[in-house]
């Protein structure tokens, strides 16, 4: 149960942060955001703000989305002869077009619609008391659809495809960007929780409780200077010296550890502990505990994880295998393991997955943010927009590829994790 809760929390945070990036910069770019949804499937909760954005919480805690005006099948169609009721503002402009028979307003003006333009001219025409009349429609007017859903109209100037190229590019990039920021922030938080960043350039050590070194008398911040005569000046020297000193070590044999404690040099016999095929002496690298060191340490961890993910992506391209990919099932399995290991493991997993999600979404495949960014760049180079039909077909092809890949990855994960 704890694994499921951890999975939902991690996945939910990653999705909210990612989609908020798209949402925020779409608004800043003048694009009307129809809906900001967390989860998929039937609505559990919904709220419409003054800007016309519908915020929804949906039943399945898997994914989420930001729906912008001008994307896909976004146009509201009103059939000729459809009965409607119009609500006018003080200037005589239509501020509400009600097509629902279940939400009637007795103060509104009844009309049978014969024509309309809610994108360019912003007008609606119809029969009012058997007389044809045309009314101007306010830029921020709303439509109550037949099922009772109220949405804002989307004039051309607030549709996605009519925003500036720069606005669209930053809107598409903002999701992955937010994932990178989240990953960096969580890694920095993790370093602070751990007390600092391991200092691999030093030979000062932290001594593990009940470990071999602790039993021999070593204490935190002691300085190991030699192991079996091998000089130690850094953590790498220490690990190599332990490896060399224990290479032919018998079951009950010890090694000599020379260390400096409170300016006094001491040599003790330490009995290494065997773990799998390697020996350890129960010490960790000392920590750099300065505020700046912690900040830089978090950035270093984030860069290290990003570099690892990029190398894995390179390996995936040169030698594709489903076993190198993981979907929601694999993510649940990792969340379950992290939950059992405590808060630091959960935070580490969240940070890694956030950076992973950011990099994955920048792959230039249609339907991913990277594919949209690529089309923005092509449009900027050509200095003319890509036809909407062409863009729609390209996106549809990308969606089909991603759906097939996701099904294959999920099936592979199920077989790997549960069987």
From Swiss-Prot:
One example GO MF annotation: metal ion binding
Membrane topology: Multi-pass membrane protein
The keyword rRNA processing is annotated on this UniProt entry: no
Pfam short name (any one): Peptidase_M50
UniProt-annotated location(s): Cell membrane
Primary residence: membrane
Keyword terms of this UniProt record: Cell membrane, Hydrolase, Membrane, Metal-binding, Metalloprotease, Protease, Transmembrane, Transmembrane helix, Zinc
Family: Belongs to the peptidase M50B family.
Protein name, as recorded: Putative zinc metalloprotease SPy_1963/M5005_Spy1674
Classification lineage: Bacteria, Bacillati, Bacillota, Bacilli, Lactobacillales
């Amino acid at each position: 149960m704890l694994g499921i809760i951890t999975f939902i929390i991690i996945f939910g945070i990653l999705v909210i942060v990612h989609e908020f990036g798209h949402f925020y910069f779409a608004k800043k770019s003048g694009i009307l955001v129809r809906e900001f949804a967390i989860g998929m499937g039937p609505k559990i909760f919904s709220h419409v703000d003054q800007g016309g954005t519908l915020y929804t919480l949906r039943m399945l805690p898997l994914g989420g989305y930001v729906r912008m005006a001008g994307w896909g099948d976004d146009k509201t169609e009103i059939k000729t002869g459809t009965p409607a009721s119009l609500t006018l503002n003080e200037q005589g402009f239509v501020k509400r077009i009600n097509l629902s028979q279940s939400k009637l307003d007795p103060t509104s003006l009844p009309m049978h619609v014969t024509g309309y333009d809610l994108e360019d001219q912003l007008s609606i025409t119809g029969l009012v008391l058997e007389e044809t009349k045309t009314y101007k429609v306010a830029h921020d007017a709303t439509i109550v659809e037949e099922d009772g859903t109220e949405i804002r109209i989307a004039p051309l100037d607030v549709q996605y495809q009519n925003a500036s190229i720069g606005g669209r590019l930053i809107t598409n990039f903002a999701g992955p960007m937010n994932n990178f920021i989240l990953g960096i922030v969580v890694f920095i938080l993790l370093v602070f929780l751990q007390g600092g960043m391991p200092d691999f350039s030093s030979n000062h050590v932290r001594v593990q409780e009940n470990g071999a070194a602790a039993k021999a008398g070593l204490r935190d911040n002691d300085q190991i200077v030699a192991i079996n005569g091998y000089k130690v000046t850094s953590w790498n020297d220490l690990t190599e010296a332990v490896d060399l000193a224990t290479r032919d070590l018998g079951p009950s044999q010890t090694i000599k550890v020379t260390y400096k404690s409170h300016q006094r040099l001491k040599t003790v016999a330490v009995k290494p502990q065997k773990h799998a095929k390697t020996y350890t002496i129960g010490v960790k690298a000392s920590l750099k505990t300065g505020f700046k060191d912690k900040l830089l340490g978090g950035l270093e961890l984030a860069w290290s994880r990003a570099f690892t993910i990029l190398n894995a992506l390179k390996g995936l391209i040169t030698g594709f295998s489903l076993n190198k990919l993981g979907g929601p099932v694999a993510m649940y399995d990792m969340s379950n393991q992290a939950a059992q290991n405590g808060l630091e493991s959960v935070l580490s997993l969240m940070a890694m997955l956030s950076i992973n999600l950011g990099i994955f979404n920048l792959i230039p495949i249609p339907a991913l943010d990277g594919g949209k960014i690529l089309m923005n760049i092509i449009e900027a180079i050509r200095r003319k927009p890509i036809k909407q039909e062409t863009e729609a077909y390209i996106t549809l092809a990308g969606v089909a590829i991603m759906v097939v890949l996701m099904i294959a990855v999920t099936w592979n994960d199920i077989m790997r994790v549960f069987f």
